[in-house]
């Protein structure tokens, strides 16, 4: 199993980068005993101005073949943290790769979005993609702690 966050744009050094690194490091340490691999970050950038279609092509190349495709989109399902953890556990138990895709300023091209196994939303509001990365990294770590029975998550 591989876990990938494929995102449009480059993350500069700053508080967001530190938070993402911290949560993904925590996940890597806690997830090892649960059979969860470290998360890799694949950043893509369309420098030719091709828009969502060009971004989708770059994102598709970053996604492992056959991976469960999870897109972050304001039209997606709003899962609880335990529901998200259960999805991750299911992919782990199937030994299936999973790719979380975060689009750019204009979102994710419908051609890629419509082929997703799951679309999730962090609410009906639109979030800056750098904050979505932080929120996703935290939820991946939180899912790991839920699966481990760690008290980090409280109901």
UniProtKB/Swiss-Prot annotation:
Any one Gene Ontology cellular component term annotated for this protein: cytoplasm
A Gene Ontology molecular function term of the record: rRNA (pseudouridine-N3-)-methyltransferase activity
Task performed by this protein: Specifically methylates the pseudouridine at position 1915 (m3Psi1915) in 23S rRNA.
Binding positions for S-adenosyl-L-methionine per the UniProt entry: 72, 103, 122-127
Compartments, record wording: Cytoplasm
EC code: 2.1.1.177
Organism field: Paracoccus denitrificans (strain Pd 1222)
Reaction equations catalysed: pseudouridine(1915) in 23S rRNA + S-adenosyl-L-methionine = N(3)-methylpseudouridine(1915) in 23S rRNA + S-adenosyl-L-homocysteine + H(+)
Family under the similarity heading: Belongs to the RNA methyltransferase RlmH family.
Description of how the protein assembles with itself and partners: Homodimer.
Protein name as it appears in the record: Ribosomal RNA large subunit methyltransferase H
Top-level lineage group: Bacteria
Keywords (A to Z) from UniProt: Cytoplasm, Methyltransferase, rRNA processing, S-adenosyl-L-methionine, Transferase
